[in-house]
Amino acid sequence: WTSCKIGFRSIEIKNREMLINGMPVLIQGVNRHEHDPVSGKTVSRESMLEDIVLMKKYNFNAVRCAHYPNDPHWYELCDEYGIYVVDEANIETHHYYGRLCREPEWTNAFLDRTRRMVETNKNHPSIIMWSLGNESGYGPNHAACAGWIRERDSSRLLHYEGALRPEFQGDWKPDAGFNSFATDVVAPMYPTINDIVEWVKTSKDKRPLIMCEYSHAMGNSNGSLSDYWDAILNNHGLQGGFIWDWVDQGLDPEGNEKWKYGGDFGDKPNDANFCINGLVWPNRKPHPAMYEFKKLVQPVHADAIDLEMGKLELFNRRYFTALEDIFLEWRLEIDGSTVQKGTIKTLKANPRNKMQIRLNLKKPEVLIGQEVYLYLCY
């Protein structure tokens, strides 16, 4: 036996929303592989903490453990710092996508990995969903795992993308209630924006839609992030998702910031650059999409009421915390030069509430053709 910290929270589905402690928290998530550029899959506690601090800094609030249970320290840190976790069983059968899950001789192997995940990590309140695995089709073996989890732990939700897409590379099934025994959320992988908006309009499914994977971050990508989040913020039933994925999995054993992958060690066969699809470099330096995501989901949203009078309306997007810990710095620029600036040190808006502020803004002298911008920094 060993001691561990515990916590209390409630998770339930009501009216197309996943409620955490009664609030429909948007999932601002990312998929994360365990990876260190020097030690590979052996990740230190310090490296894990670096990831969590960076995620919090860029407004991520959730992680899917893709595609296996993580080091025990990871869950302890998520409990402490406030990251929601989808814990995933170490089940993935790409080439045999719809086969192993339907063969009785594999049932115990499926159940063993599922039980081990739940029994090992059940005391961590940061875990809000158990995932039955990744891209493994759907069959009786998944149903057995789902049944065991529902009997063992009714305090959390079930998540499994494969229950909505039983055929490899097939279309996901948006039918109301399709395979709802195996997943409490509609969790498609790489749906188009039109797909998810049409689902809102046409499906009678009472579950929320939380994308299992979207906005694949390989190469020059993530180009539709703002369009996805416009859809999420404006359609009841869409509750966020998990970007694929967190870190480029390059290796730098010599410490010279030349990351190797996909044949650089003379390894054949290899997957070329298919492990280089992260939002951050192997050394955790952010790619440009990180800055865009941070802006899209920032905890304060501003609307102009009367710019000449300096009147703005702020909306606190947080679900459990007021704005007293945040101050506002603003500046007015004309053609890139700051002409006015100021600070509002006290913001008072309860969770999911609005407030009005007035900037000490004087009407500037603007010549024809000049560009004027008001910048807000929280």
Where are these regions (language model features)?
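Intrinsically disordered, low-complexity Pro/Gly/Ser/Thr-rich segments with frequent PxxP/GP/PP motifs
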Residues: 327-375
